[in-house]
A protein has these predicted regions:
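Conserved phosphate-handling catalytic cores of large alpha/beta enzymes
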Residues: 372-383, 391-427, 432-437, 445
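Subset of Sec-pathway N-terminal targeting signals
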Residues: 1-40, 44
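Cofactor-binding active-site loop characterized by glycine-rich and histidine/acidic residues
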Residues: 229-394, 398, 607-660
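Glycine- and acidic
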Residues: 1-4, 15-19, 195-207, 229-230, ...
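Active-site pocket-lining segments that scaffold enzyme catalytic pockets across diverse folds
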Residues: 189, 193-253, 563, 575-589, ...
């Protein structure tokens, strides 16, 4: 009897489903079936060997082809992103092997055959032609998706089900399409207005990537419906002014005052360039939801603001929402050269799942203009994509053609839903171009003459989309012209109003958090402050931090350490640094203030001195004595060993302190001279933020053995 005769009697759809499961999660398949599929794959891969040919041909031909169609589907999932229509101004690079039928043991003659493998994608049994057409629309159109490296079956299943709905194509109503056009028009018209009114001035325009504006707008509206109340964003200079005006609601009047270069209202501030300033506002969405909008100030040093944003988001989560990650949404907008070339994105991504630094997932959007100042993308990275850092945390990546506005919004909403469901990072690679040079006074044809000839003739995304909606009879050419005119007229009014202003006003970022806290003058900084506390309170703290739980077993060395501390306080007049430090934290906690300390090995302390967090010997249960002073009526003490990073962690803690003026936030360098691993944070934020941005911060830095 043929050893595979049982396959003839079985339903091929069942085997197709099982083989698909095997290809995605081999260990989830019953061992005997896994061995069968491994044998089949081995036979296919080694089909030049006579024994392998025999083992494959013993499987019924109809089932062989069914399996090969499953392999084709799997290949589209894994490699379809390499063959997309995502680049508006360049031809795609060629990748091999491609998705041709012959690479899967199939031929054009099989196109009219019906395969049960269509069930895998939710389209039911279908001809190979229909299956391929569906796969092309899902994986090789304006959106390319990387996700098959994800190891969680639930996430894989969710992604695949979402992708196969409506062929992964947008399905917006007429009103939604008109709204996308409106936001695109704002983005395009804003840049055109600035280009006309402020000829040659640096603005780092968004031209070529204007679809970022409807994407961000869609995220804010949809996030509010998810329950998000705080939107925290970081981005560099490219497109920042456009985003400030058309997403965050900063008035054109304020922007134009900054362009006119007027003196600042307060002479004690040096200020900064207009595309570095932060902004905080309140927005009411179309559904009447209230959301606080925050875009953090940033320096010219690319990617630094990402770490700060993570810290701000974490602080808001803890301070206002009891850790509910559905209430705060962090978004970081990157440049393609920066996210690939700077080390900080890697450090930030590595933080995402750590207990002291997680924020419930970040949406990363790359405004990919395929050039870093003058450097071609082929010289800017070794990886295939600028977003390959996403694979560190197995985060999905959506590569999108920025000329396809609906695809951009569709992909962004997908990213938001993924983040809200799974609490994980997700990346969007927005492939566009840069209409001018790095800034508006730069000549890009020195280094990319061929590309810029093409860009000069290329329609902007608004005009492309307007033509589509006109063809669909959703708007008329007159409607589009009126949209443009109305927005331009509103900017003219703002410009006229700005000319009446004599001074430029810097509005402090997150001013509400710092309400009631004044900026300290030099004289105030030198005032002696009475920090004494009541002896009774100090004794209560000392008793708590020198008393181990009686029902726990600890190492003898820990028992001795705690005993020595008890004797220090109660039997002598001398105390070491660690005891003094813990007493200081304890009195603050007793008064209701939160304390956070993070850095490398800070829980125990690099020199085995702190032991702020103790481990029970047998269970390794974590004991924090400082949180047991008055459990129902005290501040929270948080101590976190950080990843081995200085740059990102100090940036994170700086952001945390920025959003927590009434807490003591400490970053400790492992050794004092290790602090220079975070030098940019010292130079651009800690030492300069107040002077540049009117931004206050209470970060405390400990430098053991520092100079």
């Amino acid at each position: 009897m043929d050893k595979y005769s049982f396959l003839n009697a079985a339903h091929t759809g069942y085997f197709a489903q099982m083989y698909d499961q095997y290809l995605q999660q081999p260990d989830s398949v019953e061992p005997s079936w896994r061995a069968f599929f491994q044998g089949f794959d081995f036979g296919v891969e080694n089909s030049q060997d006579d024994n392998s040919i025999e083992s494959v041909t013993e499987v019924p031909e109809h089932l062989q082809k069914e399996f090969r169609v499953v392999q084709l589907i799997d290949a589209y999932r894994k490699r379809g992103h390499l063959f997309t229509k995502t680049n508006p101004v360049r031809d795609r690079r060629t990748y091999q092997p491609n998705l041709a039928l012959e690479n899967f043991g199939l031929s054009p003659a099989d196109r009219n055959m019906v395969f049960n493998a269509g069930d895998i994608m939710g389209i039911g049994p279908n001809t190979l032609t229909v299956i391929i057409e569906h796969l092309e629309r899902v994986y090789c159109n304006s959106i390319g998706v990387e996700y098959m490296y994800i190891r969680n079956p639930e996430k894989l299943d969710w992604i695949q089900k979402r992708l196969h709905v409506n062929d992964n194509l947008p399905n917006f109503s007429q009103d939604e399409k008109k709204h996308i056009l409106k936001k695109l028009n704002q983005a395009v018209s804003f840049e055109t207005f600035l280009h006309t009114k402020y000829v040659g001035q640096k603005r780092f325009s968004l031209e070529g990537g204007e679809s970022l504006i409807p994407a961000l707008d869609a995220v804010v509206e949809a996030a509010a419906n998810h329950g998000v109340e705080e939107f925290v964003m970081g981005m560099a200079h490219r497109g920042r002014l456009n985003t400030l005006t058309n997403i965050f609601g900063k008035s054109g009047k304020d922007i134009f005052s900054e362009f006119d270069g007027k003196d600042y209202e307060e002479t004690v501030f040096d200020g900064d360039v207009k595309y570095h300033l932060g902004w905080t506002s309140k927005r009411t969405t179309d559904n009447g939801k209230k959301i606080n909008m925050n875009i953090a100030p940033n320096p010219s040093h690319l990617e630094t603001v990402g770490a700060v944003v993570q810290g701000i988001a974490r602080a808001k989560l803890e301070n206002s929402f009891d850790g509910d990650t559905h209430k705060v949404l962090p978004i970081i907008v990157h440049g393609d050269a920066a996210i690939a070339g700077q080390g900080l994105p890697y450090e930030i991504v590595q933080m995402a799942g750590l207990k002291g630094y997680g924020t419930g997932g970040t949406i990363h959007i790359v405004v990919n203009n395929q050039i870093g100042f003058t450097t071609n993308y082929l010289d800017a990275r070794s990886s295939t994509y600028c977003t390959d850092v996403a694979k560190v945390t197995l985060s999905p990546v959506l590569h999108v053609n920025s000329d396809d506005a609906e695809a951009v919004v569709h992909a962004t909403l997908f990213a938001l839903d993924y983040r809200m469901k799974f609490g994980r990072d997700v990346f969007i690679d927005l492939l566009g171009y840069r209409k001018y040079g790095h800034n508006e006074g730069d000549e890009p044809r020195f280094t990319q003459p061929k590309l810029y000839k093409k860009i000069a003739k290329h329609q902007n995304p608004r005009d492309i989309y307007a033509d589509q909606l006109i063809a669909q009879n959703i708007v008329t050419a007159a409607d589009v012209k009126q949209l443009e005119l109305d927005y331009k007229n509103s900017l003219e009014v703002d410009l006229k109003d700005s000319r009446k202003e004599e001074k430029t006003i810097i509005t402090p970022f997150m001013a509400d958090e710092w309400e009631g806290l004044s900026l300290a003058k030099a004289k105030k900084m030198k005032e002696v402050v009475d920090t004494k506390v009541d002896k009774k309170m100090l004794t209560e703290v000392a008793t708590t931090i020198t008393t181990l739980p009686a029902d726990k077993k600890f190492l003898r060395k820990i028992e001795k350490l705690i005993g020595d501390r008890r004797r220090m306080y109660f039997e002598s007049d001398a105390m070491d640094w660690a005891m003094g430090e813990l007493l200081a934290y304890g009195t603050l906690l007793k008064e209701g203030f939160d304390v956070r300390i993070s850095g490398q090995d800070v829980e125990r302390g690099t020199f085995s001195h702190r032991h702020a967090l103790l481990k029970a010997e047998e269970s390794e249960e974590e004991i924090v004595l400082l949180n047991t002073i008055s459990p129902e009526n005290q501040g929270k003490f948080s101590v976190y060993n950080s990843l081995l990073s200085e740059y990102a962690v100090l940036g994170f803690d700086y952001g945390f302190a920025m959003a927590s003026p009434n807490a003591l936030t400490i970053w400790e360098a492992q050794f004092g001279d290790f602090s220079n691993g975070a030098q940019i944070m010292f130079d651009q934020y800690i030492s300069a933020a107040e002077d540049k941005w009117k931004a206050q911060n209470g970060i405390v830095v400990l430098l053991p053995h520092g100079y």
